[in-house]
Amino acid sequence: VYKRQDELGINSETLLSKTESIVHGTTVATNALLERKGAKTGLLTTLGHRDVLEMREGLKDDRYNMRLPAPAPLVPRFLRLGVRERIKPDGRIHTELDNTSLDEAINKLREEKVTSVAVCYLHAYKEPKHEQETKQILEAKLPGVSVSISSEVFPEIKEYERVSTTIVNLSLI
């Protein structure tokens, strides 16, 4: 600020009154992700789809190096839990959200003392009803725990991208 006011030949009060925004960039978020210092996050997915983070759409950093280990997912497998529900690709409900299945998952996350929960159900970008219901239940049963749903964070068709973006969003809260 001082350098810029000197360059313009005005005082700081005048400079700030004419300033629309001040942007400050850091690597704090990037460092937190790389060093895995984010929030302890749980993931709720459609039953049978908790490993999408490890499958990564089959992509590898070096596709021809079979010995190159993939980086560990931001959410360990024991904190990735399946919930019985299913939305079809066209947005129609195939299987209603099973509250018993959801309650079991919530109890496990409570036991593990997670500080945030990501919810990413199949095809929620088309029909977010189950994710929205899950968010309301989580907020009631796990007060103080941050909750993000993929249909709000990144409502796009690709499952891996929705899951990973929602998790990164929560990891940095």
What are these regions (language model features)?
Residues 3-173:
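N-terminally biased helix-coil "hinge/interface" segments that flank
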